[in-house]
Amino acid sequence: MTNMRKKHPLLKIINHSFIDLPAPSNISSWWNFGSLLGMCLVLQIITGLFLAMHYTADTTTAFSSVTHICRDVNYGWVIRYLHANGASMFFMCLFLHVGRGLYYGSYLYLETWNIGVILLFATMATAFMGYVLPWGQMSFWGATVITNLLSAIPYIGTDLVEWIWGGFSVDKATLTRFFAFHFILPFIITALVLVHLLFLHETGSNNPLGIISDADKIPFHPYYTIKDILGVVALLTVLSSLVLFSPDLLGDPDNYTPANPLNTPPHIKPEWYFLFAYAILRSIPNKLGGVLALVMSILILMFVPFLHTSKQRSMTFRPISQCLFWILVADLITLTWIGGQPVEHPFIIIGQVASILYFTIIIILMPLAGWLENYLMKW
């Protein structure tokens, strides 16, 4: 069996990726989120497939087909809520995974990091289109507001929006194509994940000290497989508790009202995991400026490796950078809160200050802190 594991063309790939993979001996639980994201992706594809068997992508029947899934299909409500809350877990793990990368300097593995950012964009696009499918009030108005932002693009904006809509408003054509894209994107994400892993295994994992660990490696199995199983059990405990006790905790009550183009909800807002970007979008009075800020709020991650000025890779021994990092985390939590509030005083000014702080920390303060820490090391 050992020989087969090491010689069989297919098993050899699995062996080199998950069994005999040399891993640093000191990676902490912050390195668990990669495997958790993989588990979330598999869960989303499986539950999504079963939902697609009963869902109809038509404006007249979409809402009632979701109701049918919850009421008439055997354990349909479990599948539906696992899928909806699984998305929340997915983004929770994503944000922690990206945060880990920022803190420990994993972004210096350029290819792995950039594909990770593309994965983040693809996951956000998938989640947005999935939110439109139940065809509730927030689905319809969310789709209208977000797609309409593309009209801010000079010259081609309006044509682009109507092309995406498949008409002059969000309607049947929009829902059908969103369903098609929502179905195919997770498989594209899976392919990107394999490329992400391919590049990661070219360099090997980073570690909390941010130093080369070639002299002290241990096999991935059994050490990190067991460690990952603990993470999976913890995640499934949280997810199942959410699904079974409070499935609508993270959803919007407006989405239990069928979509009505003649009635605008008082507060149009996306799911919680988009609120920070939505707050940045709303903080700029100009439409095109807001759209650019929205895109840059994620795209800025691609510039982080080029803004790294410190001689140390990780923030483990860099207290000034640590302070800035945790201020950034607090700022993102503030932006998430602001994104869910109405556009009125004092929320407008708080959102604007938090948005400016977000970009200032990443573009200006972090590189300055790295430079200062280098200077203090000499001193």
From Swiss-Prot:
InterPro entries: Cyt_b/b6_C, Cyt_b/b6_C_sf, Cyt_b/b6_N, Cytb/b6-like_sf, Cytochrome_b, Cytochrome_b_C_euk/bac, Cytochrome_b_N_euk/bac, Di-haem_cyt_TM. Its main location: mitochondrion. One of its GO terms (biological process) is mitochondrial electron transport, ubiquinol to cytochrome c. The keyword Magnesium does not apply. It is a multi-pass membrane protein. Binds 2 heme b groups non-covalently. GO terms for molecular function: metal ion binding; ubiquinol-cytochrome-c reductase activity. It comes from the Eukaryota. SUPFAM superfamilies: a domain/subunit of cytochrome bc1 complex (Ubiquinol-cytochrome c reductase), Transmembrane di-heme cytochromes. Keywords: Electron transport, Heme, Iron, Membrane, Metal-binding, Mitochondrion, Mitochondrion inner membrane, Respiratory chain, Transmembrane, Transmembrane helix, Transport, Ubiquinone. Its cofactor is heme b. Pfam families: Cytochrom_B_C, Cytochrome_B. The keyword Magnesium does not apply. Gene3D superfamilies: Cytochrome Bc1 Complex, Chain C. Heme b b566 binds at H97, H196. The chain crosses the membrane at residues 33-53, 77-98, 113-133, 178-198, 226-246, 288-308, 320-340, 347-367. Belongs to the cytochrome b family. Component of the ubiquinol-cytochrome c reductase complex (complex III or cytochrome b-c1 complex) that is part of the mitochondrial respiratory chain. The b-c1 complex mediates electron transfer from ubiquinol to cytochrome c. Contributes to the generation of a proton gradient across the mitochondrial membrane that is then used for ATP synthesis. Heme 1 (or BL or b562) is low-potential and absorbs at about 562 nm, and heme 2 (or BH or b566) is high-potential and absorbs at about 566 nm. The cytochrome bc1 complex contains 11 subunits: 3 respiratory subunits (MT-CYB, CYC1 and UQCRFS1), 2 core proteins (UQCRC1 and UQCRC2) and 6 low-molecular weight proteins (UQCRH/QCR6, UQCRB/QCR7, UQCRQ/QCR8, UQCR10/QCR9, UQCR11/QCR10 and a cleavage product of UQCRFS1). This cytochrome bc1 complex then forms a dimer. This is Cytochrome b. The gene is MT-CYB.
